[in-house]
């Protein structure tokens, strides 16, 4: 299966971190031929691990054979990319967070036009999309993950920062 991810990969924005981790995990699956289309360039300011950058650069350097096409194109960016995939057989999946009580009006129509499926990180966003008119069968909730090496319950609690909790 050929999967392409379109989005940012090289900064520390929340969408970028998710894209980067999805790409790194999918790249380890022998049943997936992964390609990425970065919408950003690497900058050392992000402080990314050199091994991660090398892996992403190696993936982004790959080109899809002229006779092939992505089976699935995952789009995770803001604003969303509203365009047809390069091949009509490619299924387009949007990953789309949202933080407000209503989606932009045009998104419902554009998702119906361009998306084969939409993934959102919470039931709250799913409910907003469904209330906005999106077919409930075309949307799935997949919560954002966390890195248990960074957020480890066994680590000692953080030291207080000298903030008076009675004031807040």
Roles of regions detected by a PLM:
Residues 1, 90, 166-168:
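Nucleotide donor/acceptor-binding cores
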Residues 1-43:
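N-terminal subdomain of nucleotide-sugar transferases
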Residues 37, 95, 142:
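Hydrophobic residues at beta-strand termini and immediately following loops
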Residues 105-107, 145-168:
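Acidic anion/phosphate-binding donor-loop and adjacent secondary structure
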Residues 126-146, 153-154:
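Helix-loop-beta element that forms the nucleotide-linked donor phosphate-binding surface
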Residues 4, 43-130:
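Extended catalytic core of nucleotide-activated donor transferases of GT-like folds
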Residues 26-35, 115-117, 123, 135-138:
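Structural alpha-beta junctions
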Residues 8-9, 97-98, 144:
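Conserved donor-binding loops in enzymes that form glycosidic bonds
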């Amino acid at each position: 299966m050929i999967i392409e991810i379109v989005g940012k990969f090289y900064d520390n924005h929340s969408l970028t971190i998710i894209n980067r981790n999805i790409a790194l995990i999918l790249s380890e699956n022998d049943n997936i031929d992964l390609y990425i289309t970065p919408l950003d360039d690497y900058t050392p300011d992000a402080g990314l691990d050199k091994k991660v950058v090398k892996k992403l650069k190696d993936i982004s350097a790959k080109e899809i054979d002229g006779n092939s096409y992505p089976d699935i194109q995952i789009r995770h960016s803001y604003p969303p990319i509203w365009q047809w995939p390069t091949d009509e057989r490619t299924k387009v999946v949007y990953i789309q967070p949202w933080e407000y009580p209503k989606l932009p009006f045009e998104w419902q129509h554009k998702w119906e036009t361009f998306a084969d499926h939409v993934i959102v990180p919470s039931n709250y966003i799913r409910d907003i999309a469904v209330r906005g008119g999106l077919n409930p069968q075309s949307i799935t909730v997949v919560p954002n993950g966390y890195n248990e090496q960074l957020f480890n319950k066994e680590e000692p609690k953080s030291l207080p920062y000298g903030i008076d909790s009675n004031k807040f």
